[in-house]
């Protein structure tokens, strides 16, 4: 393995850990504020955390590459907004652990999108991974009465949006300055979230102050740090390769939900999670076999 690839893999693994535990912060936030308020505020914090990086990079050659970055950031920001919105609203109705595994389905969706856009042939590993992930999601989310929980449906839609976002970032990461692209997409997400929050939700300062720590983690770490590292890490890692590492996000979400929120998975749900993780890995490891 090339040293650059190893470095990128390590960076993306760190991103997966940050995002996995971010499900806990997001779930705690839902006890006090609306989903769009939480997202809007944490993306504002994420933008602020990026400003010092941009300032110190102002004289570097890559920092002067601005042509087209606004358009690129708006496109990636819209898909990021859709994904994070479906996920955050879904967390009102489901657990952090379940949301982590369902969100992780985007690693199965990415190869299918690549097949669609590039007209690649569907590999056996992709089909096996999709089947395992589908069975796993059925066990995890569908009740004994064959009803799928509303929150799980919303989180599944977020997985589709994140799959598009991953592919878009994979194509843009080598063309633009990492911090600036991250700032633009986060700013787009913050503005859209706050606009929706002003229409449908109520701002209560005392409730916002109660979640200062989850907001700081969700804003500075999950947004400012993680999304910047994602863009930087994907410079030497293709989207399908990055998706393998990001599949571990669901494992860290389950660990965080169990350790911090005392969430417990039933035997049926645990089997579903195991099948989903296996499907995610198989779909990527045997994608080009």
PLM region spans:
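Specific transmembrane alpha-helical segments of multi-pass solute transporters/efflux pumps
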Residues: 22-23, 51-103, 139, 219-237
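Hydrophobic transmembrane alpha-helices of multi-pass small-molecule transport proteins
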Residues: 50, 122-142, 160-162, 191-193, ...
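Specific alpha-helical transmembrane segments that line the substrate/conduction pathway
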Residues: 37-48, 88-119, 124, 158, ...
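Helix-helix packing/entry segments at the starts of transmembrane helices
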Residues: 39-41, 99-105, 169-191, 223-259
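Transmembrane alpha-helical segments that form core, pore/gating elements
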Residues: 46-50, 110-112, 116, 147-201, ...
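Glycine-/small-residue-enriched transmembrane alpha-helix faces in small-molecule transporters
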Residues: 1-37, 78, 86, 144-171, ...
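C-terminal-most transmembrane helix of multi-pass membrane proteins
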Residues: 43, 51, 55, 211-213, ...
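Hydrophobic/small/kink-forming positions within alpha-helical transmembrane segments
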Residues: 20, 24, 51, 77, ...
């Amino acid at each position: 393995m090339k040293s650059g690839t190893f470095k990128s893999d390590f960076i993306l693994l760190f991103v997966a850990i940050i995002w996995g535990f971010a499900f806990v912060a997001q779930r705690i936030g839902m006890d006090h504020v609306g989903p769009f308020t939480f997202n809007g505020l944490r993306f504002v914090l994420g933008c602020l955390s990026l400003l010092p990086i941009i300032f110190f990079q102002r004289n570097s050659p890559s920092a002067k590459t601005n042509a087209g970055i606004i358009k690129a950031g708006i496109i990636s920001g819209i898909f990021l907004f859709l994904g994070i919105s479906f996920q955050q609203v879904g967390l009102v109705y489901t657990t952090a652990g379940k949301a982590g595994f369902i969100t992780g389905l985007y690693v199965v969706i990415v190869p299918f999108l690549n097949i669609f856009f590039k007209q690649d042939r569907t590999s056996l590993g992709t089909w096996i991974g999709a089947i395992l992930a589908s069975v796993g999601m059925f066990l995890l989310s569908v009740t004994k009465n064959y009803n799928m929980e509303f929150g799980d449906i919303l989180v599944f839609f977020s997985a589709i949006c994140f799959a598009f976002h991953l592919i878009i970032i994979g194509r843009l990461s080598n063309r633009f300055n990492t911090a600036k692209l991250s700032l633009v997409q986060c700013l787009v997400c913050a503005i859209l979230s706050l606009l929706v929050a002003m229409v449908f939700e109520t701002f209560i300062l005392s409730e916002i102050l109660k979640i200062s720590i989850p907001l700081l983690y969700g804003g500075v770490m999950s947004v400012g740090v993680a999304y910047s590292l994602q863009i930087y890490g994907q410079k030497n890692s293709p989207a399908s390769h990055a998706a393998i590492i990001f599949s571990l996000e669901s494992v860290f979400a389950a660990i965080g939900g169990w350790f911090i929120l005392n969430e417990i998975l039933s035997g049926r749900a645990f089997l579903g999670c195991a099948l989903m993780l296996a499907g995610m890995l198989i779909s990527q490891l045997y994608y080009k076999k």
